[in-house]
Swiss-Prot record:
Keywords: ATP-binding, Carbohydrate metabolism, Glycogen biosynthesis, Glycogen metabolism, Nucleotide-binding, Nucleotidyltransferase, Transferase. HAMAP family: GlgC (MF_00624). GO terms for molecular function: ATP binding; glucose-1-phosphate adenylyltransferase activity. It holds the Pfam family Hexapep_GlmU. It catalyses: alpha-D-glucose 1-phosphate + ATP + H(+) = ADP-alpha-D-glucose + diphosphate. This is Glucose-1-phosphate adenylyltransferase.
């Protein structure tokens, strides 16, 4: 029997991320590079480490190899523990054959044995594909104080975007009275962040109930949470007011990277009290040539800059040759940009080679973002 834990985190990291197009052709969405030196999953894992959550199960499925290699034993996030720590949980074969995760609830249900060994009081369920910084221990305190069966972290979203999210309708005490999955005509703009705290006994009971229902799609938002409400369980909304971004599309991924370049951003990567940890690529120092110009940009290790870079994010090992301009763009690891190239409002994928004289910018709508990438 493993050492008993008060709270165990389960991090859902198996999503395909098809809206990110070629960036996720051969890569799980949580492993997509972000912010010049990170992967998307770094934010959730760092939140766990900073919140004192020491036992994390990571549920993977789609294109898991690079993600598994990246996570390793969790030492980058100080989660390489003798008891607990990080455990990668892909689907596995039983006597009846391999059982794939069919939904978010299915993924947790198939790993109830993993949870049971820790005898937790609470289970924190997380998504590995959002950008935010959050102290989960404060949410757990709120959950306990409110004597909730389930607590769901929510954030106010613009009304014209509310129909894209699971929306919570609450009373004055922030108790959830109705849950609507992507409503056409929302009555609230409190969106679910995909962060749940369950009392362990409730989670186990309702996942087993959901698994027995042949009509269920095995999803928390569509099936489990509405059932809990129907049966009178106490669901509380936990309001979150910091930065949070769903980077599920090429444009939203670009926007989140651009947010890092603002003079005042609520997503401060320089906060020494809440560090975002990552695997160190061990590249040499960046080199900025004499005639190069760099403004308002994040430039990681191993970059060689001989041209101009303005308001952009460059990952490790990027080369920008003489005469080239990179403006309002994200250039992912190892990309090579030749001479006299113009790149504007674009994401350039890992290891891409941009030939001399190429011009890359939105052709029709100036608000668009261009993606130049190939699945490896």
């Amino acid at each position: 029997m493993a050492q008993k834990q008060k709270c165990v985190a389960m991090l859902l990291a198996g999503g395909k991320g098809s809206r990110l197009s070629a960036l996720t052709k051969n890569l799980a969405k949580p492993a997509v590079p972000f912010g010049g030196k990170y992967r998307i999953i770094d934010f959730t894992l760092s939140n766990c480490a900073n919140s004192g959550i020491e036992t994390v199960g990571i549920l993977t499925q789609y294109q898991p190899l690079e993600l598994h290699n990246y996570i390793g034993i969790g030492n980058a996030w100080d989660l390489d523990r003798v008891s607990g720590g990080v455990t990668v949980l892909p689907p596995y074969a039983e006597s009846s054959g391999v059982k794939w995760y069919t939904g978010t609830a299915s993924a947790i249900y198939q790993n109830l044995n993993y949870l049971s060994q820790y005898e937790p009081e609470y289970v924190l369920i997380l998504s590995g594909d959002h950008i935010y910084k959050m102290d989960y221990s404060k949410m757990l305190d709120y959950h306990i104080e409110k004597e909730a069966d389930v607590s769901i972290s929510v954030i106010e979203v613009p009304w014209d975007e509310a129909s894209r999210f699971g929306i919570m309708n609450t009373n004055e005490e922030m108790e959830i009275v109705e849950f609507e999955e992507k409503p056409q005509f929302p009555r609230s703009n409190l969106a679910s962040m995909g962060i749940y705290i369950f009392n362990w006994a409730i989670l186990k009971e309702y996942l087993e109930m959901d698994a027995r229902n042949p009509e269920s799609s095995n999803d928390f938002g569509k099936d489990v949470l509405p059932l809990l409400l129907d049966e009178g369980k106490k669901l509380m909304a936990y309001p979150f007011e910091g930065y949070w971004k769903d980077v599920g599309t090429v444009k939203s991924l670009w926007e989140a990277n651009m947010d890092l370049l603002r003079d005042e951003t609520s997503l401060n990567l320089n906060d020494r009290d809440w560090r975002i940890y990552s695997v160190n690529p061990n590249e040499p120092p960046q080199y900025i040539a004499e005639k190069a110009r760099v403004e308002e940009s994040l430039i990681n290790e191993g970059c060689v800059i001989e041209g101009d870079v303005k308001h952009s994010v460059l990952f490790q090992g990027v080369t920008v040759e003489e005469g080239s301009m990179v403006i309002d763009s994200v250039v992912m690891p190892g990309a090579k940009i030749g001479k006299n190239v113009v790149i504007e409002r674009a994401i350039v994928g890992s290891e891409m080679v941009i030939e001399d004289g190429t011009i890359i910018r939105p052709e029709k709508n100036v608000d668009d973002v261009v993606l130049i990438a190939e699945g490896k």
